[in-house]
A protein has these predicted regions:
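Active-site-proximal alpha/beta segments of enzymes that process anionic O-linked groups
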Residues: 200-268, 273-440, 551, 568
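A long, amphipathic alpha-helix that forms part
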Residues: 248-258, 398-406, 437-481
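C-terminal accessory region downstream of the catalytic core in glycan-modifying enzymes
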Residues: 555, 599-665
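Substrate-binding rim/cap in mid-to-C-terminal beta-strand-loop elements of soluble/periplasmic
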Residues: 304, 311-322, 441, 499-576
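C-terminal cap/loop subdomain of S1 sulfatases and analogous C-terminal strand-loop tails that border
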Residues: 490-494, 549-616, 620
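Transmembrane and membrane-interface helices of multi-pass
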Residues: 3-4, 12, 22-220
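Histidine-centered active-site microenvironments of extracellular/periplasmic hydrolases
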Residues: 282-284, 288-289, 472-528
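Active-site rim elements
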Residues: 70-79, 329-331, 385-389, 447-457, ...
Length: 665
């Protein structure tokens, strides 16, 4: 019996050797190729996990690289730290979402796509619209969490839709790539799902730089803002206890036909916090007050020496000016009435709005976000790091108007809205003729502080004067009627308070006003009416009717339904507003932290503040400093009308509002 020989080492005795054995070198090459493929797949997987944060950093540099490179060391380190936070957050979500099986993985994948689309799409669209990222400032005042999540942006605008859809497609693509290239090994596959809740918690709790510098990647700023508005709605925080501006939904304005008394353009120049008594309202050859530049430029203007705002709060005041509607109207009315731009556009006018105001303040952007304009800029367009209170430099908005003025098509209606006279004020020692001046709010330094304010008005007026000088030298400027006023005034302890929004005393509501019209832009009867208005008591509620008359729309049948809500009268016509006029800093457009309101009829003014349980009565012509209270009965029937209009005295705590002992604070 033959015994089979022993098989060579490494070969099975029952398997016949291949007639074409694989060379050892070929086997080694296959293994190396396989290892290279695995390394490349791992590198590709790592790149996919890093891609969301790389997208954030890259697009951020494309939008504002110069500003990022200018960060000082602490802010640069803060930015880098937030980049690491972003990297961990997106990597954890995408790592878990890369698994092809399991309900948890599918849920995290959906969450990743949702958060990626919102953070990248909404922030990209918001920056394209406002030159700044959406932050807590632009979200916390929203009364709707869903709208705050999408930045209350106008999705009818192609630029908004493009950013959001682009982010969705990119996020979906990253999920596909993750499931192809990210192959978690056993332990990472078990551990990363446990990190998801910690990652989500971290991005809503770790502080961010969300104002001015925004030295945090925008995805982290976005999640911080969403968390802030959610906590506000849940009552965990009270950063926005009072109602602020919400998005308007204006009624449709029918097509109208403009029939102005003379062919003309109309321009409103709106100042901020400027008192009447620091302004040369009449032309004065040797003006000693703060508005020397505009005074010298327009000697033939029609002064309005007794013009008063109906509020000393900007948001309420601009509503009064631009809508003509009483500030005491219902909330739905205040958010649905058209504004001057809506009427002008319905009549075929070109329209513009330029402002140095930072409209991130108190949701103010929502009031003008949807106005129909061909030219528009806000503070963050001019300077993305503009101050929330003082805005961008008034000089910058004048530059923008000068740059774009020639692009407007006549006839047009435009508004230039300044900002730097708002506290804490924009001051330049090189342009400060009022001395001694000191930024010191202590009582013993009150006059120096007021001089500081005068110098601020002087500097801002320089920017206004430069803009108007340019406009008057253009062909279109020679056909443009200019109306000038301020949203409200500013108090300096005349009645124990500083600033504005705190009362309806004259230091806060008596404002400068004038109309300047080149030859041939007004009819003789319009000139006569404006000349007669010099010393007559007129109101901001008269300005919207005045603009509509200048635009040739006041008598249009299409305007009649909207005129029913307007109580004012055109200053270009002889009829004046003689009925009682509401004055208030508390409305359904903008609630007040310090309650105050009143009424006026002719020279008689009724006012009350947070601590008052009865009204005070003054005659502002006989007693311009409002030092002698005449008693409620001297203003009859205004006290009864005020109680009917405002329902309670300011010292009554409204239901649902925490009681505050104002006598001790």
């Amino acid at each position: 019996m033959e015994v089979p020989s022993e098989a060579p080492s490494g070969e099975h005795p029952d398997v016949e050797p291949s007639p074409h054995p694989r060379p050892a070198r070929a086997n080694a090459g296959g293994i190396a190729s396989h290892r290279r493929a695995r390394r490349l797949r791992r590198l590709a997987g790592l790149a996919v996990l890093m891609a969301p944060t790389l997208w954030v950093v890259t697009t951020d540099f494309l939008r504002r690289g110069r500003l990022l490179l200018a960060f000082d060391r602490p802010h640069a380190l803060g930015y880098l730290g937030s980049v690491v936070e972003s990297l961990i957050f997106w990597s954890v979500l995408l790592h878990v979402a890369a698994r092809r099986r399991g309900g948890f993985s599918a849920g995290v994948a959906a969450l990743f796509l949702l958060l990626f689309t919102l953070a990248m799409g909404i922030e990209g669209a918001f920056h394209a619209f406002y030159n700044i990222y959406l932050s807590m400032d632009g979200q916390v005042h929203s009364k709707s969490i869903p709208w705050s999540i999408v930045g209350t942006l106008p999705f009818s605008r192609p630029i908004v839709l493009a950013h959001v859809l682009g982010a969705f497609v990119l996020g979906a693509g990253l999920l596909v790539l993750a499931r192809r290239f990210v192959r978690p090994s056993l332990w990472p596959r078990r551990i990363t799902p446990l990190l998801v809740p910690f990652a989500l918690y971290a991005v809503i709790r770790i502080p961010v730089s969300y104002r001015t510098l925004q030295s945090t990647p925008f995805d982290m700023i976005y999640f911080h803002g969403v968390a802030a508005v959610t906590r506000e709605h849940l009552g965990i925080t009270h950063d926005s206890p009072d109602l602020r501006v919400q998005r308007r939904e204006p009624d449709d304005v029918p097509a109208m036909t403009a029939r102005p008394a003379r062919p003309r353009n109309v321009l409103l120049v709106l100042q901020e916090s400027q008192r009447a008594d620091v302004s040369c309202i009449d032309y004065e050859p040797d003006c000693k007050l703060a508005t020397r530049f505009t005074n010298k430029l327009l000697p033939g203007r029609f002064p309005l020496r007794q013009l008063r705002s109906n509020a000393s709060t900007t948001a309420i005041s601009i509503s009064n000016i631009w809508s003509g509607v009483r500030p005491t109207e219902r909330r739905d009315t205040l958010h649905s009435v058209p504004l001057l731009w809506d009427y002008a556009r319905a009549a075929g006018y070109d329209t513009a709005y330029w402002t140095s105001q930072n409209l991130m303040f108190g949701n103010a952007r929502l009031y003008v976000q949807d106005i129909p304009v061909s030219h528009r800029c806000v503070a963050t367009d001019l300077d993305s790091q503009s101050d929330l209170d003082t805005g961008a430099s008034d000089s910058l908005v004048s530059d923008r108007v000068i740059e774009e003025w020639g692009e407007l098509k006549e006839p047009f209606f435009a508004v230039v809205h300044y900002s730097n006279v708002h506290f804490p004020y924009v001051y330049d020692e090189e342009f400060a003729p009022f001395q001694p001046a000191d930024m010191d709010k202590s009582a013993e330094k009150n006059e120096e502080f007021k001089n500081y304010y005068r110098n601020v008005v002087y500097l801002s007026d320089m920017a206004v004067g430069r803009m108007l000088s340019y406009i008057r030298d253009t062909d279109a400027g020679k056909r443009t009627v200019v109306v000038y006023t301020s949203d409200h005034g500013e108090s300096f302890r005349e009645h124990w308070q500083l600033g504005h929004t705190s009362s309806v005393y004259d230091e806060e509501i008596h404002v400068p006003g004038w109309v300047d019209a080149p030859p041939g832009t007004l009819a003789p009867e319009e000139e006569e009416s404006l000349r007669a208005a010099r010393d007559e008591l007129v109101w901001h509620l008269d300005l919207a009717p005045t603009f509509l008359d200048l635009l040739g729309l006041w008598d249009d049948p299409g305007l009649r339904p909207f005129r029913d809500h307007m109580m004012g009268h055109p200053l270009t016509r002889r009829e004046r507003t003689t009925e009682p006029v509401p004055l208030t800093n508390c409305t359904w457009l903008w609630e007040c932290a310090f309650r105050n309101w009143g009424m006026m009829q002719g020279p008689l003014k009724l006012e009350a503040r947070e601590w008052d349980n009865e009204y005070h009565c003054f005659n502002v012509l006989d007693d311009p400093d409002e030092l002698h209270n005449l008693g409620e009965q001297a203003c009859a029937p205004l006290p009864d009308l005020a109680r009917s209009t405002f329902h309670v005295m300011p010292n009554i705590t409204p239901p649902g509002r925490p009681h505050t002992d104002w006598g001790k604070k």
